[in-house]
UniProtKB/Swiss-Prot annotation:
This is Elongation factor Ts. It comes from Macrococcus caseolyticus (strain JCSC5402). Belongs to the EF-Ts family. The keyword Protein biosynthesis applies. SUPFAM superfamilies: Elongation factor Ts (EF-Ts), dimerisation domain, UBA-like. GO terms for molecular function: translation elongation factor activity. The lineage of its organism: Bacteria, Bacillati, Bacillota, Bacilli, Bacillales. One of its GO terms (cellular component) is cytoplasm.
Length: 293
């Protein structure tokens, strides 16, 4: 497979590794970018990629609750200017209220649902597009339920750039739940606890850590212990309950919630535009792209 300049660029963006290292990794893995990420990590050249898609789309996240139901949603616009527009913000709130009231099963059901007499959500959005003059996309939403004995943690960071909805069990301390949601916004864990990490992911990480240790020239007899220690540290980094609590690093999130009589049941974290990349090719990139073909 031809290793194009665009492929090298993508790998550099995902790993932060140098151009020649990326080119070699892609050559060794026959252009498989995921395998190339692993190759670079095994060589100690790149850190674990945390969903390294560039954040590019504009818009906002929004979180709201009513009784024992809460919603987190993302509404995208083309520019940040529109995202701060009062009409846009009112639309976001209206969508959240509608979702809480109707509890649609998915995005398709939401778009087809009636938000006003004779008017669907899709029609409402199209009208807003005509008024505002930009393409708007209701990209995603999630609903969460709790009992009277639980609490929602609702947090918006940077005016909605990041939104978090957490459910804390066996505690009605909404302030503590909000603090945990703020922690999740800041540290971006992947899982609630290590029980949620699949055996496949653990084995994958173990293999990478083993290769790292071997490539560092460590003796075989101590590699296993090194892998165990590094895997434990990796799990502490990706599991919310094991992370040092952002407001008091002397205790973990689990310990903080335990002091309030609760535990973290679930969370969802949205960051505006994650996974969406605007095309931003400049002339130099275009020329490199042509040369690489």
């Amino acid at each position: 497979m031809a290793i194009t300049a665009q492929l090298v660029k993508q790998l550099r963006e995902r790993t932060g590794a140098g151009m020649m290292d990326c080119k070699k990794a892609l050559t060794e893995t026959n252009g498989d970018i995921d395998a190339a990420v692993d190759y670079l990590r095994e060589k100690g050249i790149a850190k674990a990629a945390k969903k390294a898609d560039r954040i590019a789309a504009e818009g906002t996240t929004y979180v709201a609750s009513s009784g024992n139901t809460a919603v987190l949603l993302e509404l995208n616009s083309e520019t940040d200017f529109v995202a701060r527009n009062e009409g846009f913000q009112a639309l976001v709130k209206e969508m959240a209220d509608h979702i809480l009231a109707t509890k649609p099963a998915d995005l398709d059901a939401l778009m087809a649902s009636e938000i006003e007499t004779g008017k669907t959500v899709e029609t409402k959005l199209n009208e807003a597009i005509s008024t505002i003059g930009e393409k708007l996309t209701l990209r995603r939403f999630v609903l969460a339920e709790k009992t009277d004995a639980d609490a929602f943690g609702e947090y918006l960071h940077m005016g909605g750039r990041i939104g978090v909805l957490a459910v804390v069990e066996n505690s009605t301390d909404a302030e503590a739940a909000k603090d945990v949601a703020m922690h999740i916004a800041a540290l971006n864990p992947k899982f609630v606890s290590r029980e949620q990490v699949s055996a496949e992911e653990l084995e994958h990480e173990k293999e990478i850590l083993k290769q790292q240790a071997l490539n560092e020239g460590k003796p075989e007899n101590i590699v296993e212990k090194m892998v165990e220690g590094r895997l434990r540290k990796y799990l502490e980094e990706i599991c919310a309950v094991d992370q040092p609590f952002v407001k008091n690093p002397d205790q973990t999130v689990a310990e903080f919630l335990k002091s309030k009589g609760g535990s973290l049941k679930s969370f969802v974290r949205y960051e505006v535009g994650e996974g969406i990349e605007k095309r931003q090719d400049n002339f130099a990139d275009e020329v490199m792209g042509q040369m690489g073909k």
